[in-house]
């Protein structure tokens, strides 16, 4: 892939926000605009890869990575994760898509978090694309979930009725030393 790395921006068109290695952030007003933009990016990627004899494959885990060989992404946040969770941070070589939804109020964000939480099993079924772990078929359609579920603050958001309850719960997690920031919450649906 080194030859691809050298020429990847030559044909890619206008730049997008790239917050880190392997991450792409796109902000659009409507779902239709986001779908059109992602479709165009997918087509551009496919064309560029074909010119360079590279295949494209999607998934939620790397199909044959070996976690002891993973490097921790440079930066305080990931170094802290590694110090706190050790090998879990290296096993956390997963990727996926997340969506930010704008809300008119903090209480609406909590309501939406709770309302979307009941659909998580359907989201998982629709996105099942990670059957391999360390090069072996896991017999799970979404082994990615197992990597995330190892973290203490993963899974469903606890039942919270409003933003005040969320801030009290989060303050409790901080006081216990479990969470330093909101990004420490690996909930399936998370308010921000």
Model-flagged regions — what are they?
Residues 1-95:
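Terminal catalytic/cofactor-binding subdomain
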Residues 74, 104-192:
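Loop-rich catalytic cores of soluble enzymes, especially ATP-dependent carboxylate-amine ligases
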Residues 99:
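An acidic/histidine-cluster motif and surrounding catalytic segment
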